Amino acid sequence: LLMMHSEAHISTVMSPVPLTTLIQERMAALEPLASGRRIEFEFIADDEIHITGIRERLVSLIDNLIENAVKYSPEGGRIEVQLQSRDKSAQLRVSDAGPGIPVELRERVFDRFFRDPNQTQSGSGLGLAIVKAVTQQHNGRVNLSTSAEGGLMVTVDFPNPAFA
């Protein structure tokens, strides 16, 4: 699995992926994980947005983002997933009200197996490394910031062929 995500160039053919629908499908699949901790999902999206990509890898990216948000959110919290068309890109944002990631660690959390030493949650340290690898494979960018709730907001920008 790790090797699959660490390839710099993808040999698999990319095709149009209905990103809005894919995110809705993944949120529905991960709903039991969230409801077990009384966490609410909120999805805000423009109309269907298509990007050129590899569906299976995008599933991995979406699942890692949402699973991390659920893991670090307080019980009874809310996770906001937002998808918008931006300047020549499709922008995916996942925000939670968890502890966030200190600014000084934000670049390092993309390294494989790196974990915030102050975190008590268990994990492999691969989630955000996979997110970054898949984002790069799709010629995108990923950025971490503080959410409005004080947790983490992960922003992924994908090139949108509709604007190319």
Predicted stretch roles:
Residues G76-K88:
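Short beta-strand/loop element within the Bergerat-fold HATPase_c
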Residues A69-V70:
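Short helix-loop "hinge" at the ATP-lid/N-box region of the Bergerat-fold HATPase_c
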Residues S15-P16, S35-G36, E40-I49, E56:
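Conserved catalytic submotifs in the C-terminal HATPase_c
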Residues I101-F113:
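Short conserved segment of the HATPase_c
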Residues V13-A28, E42:
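A conserved beta-strand-to-alpha-helix junction within the catalytic ATP-binding
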Residues E7-V13, H50-G53:
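Conserved micro-motifs of the catalytic ATP-binding
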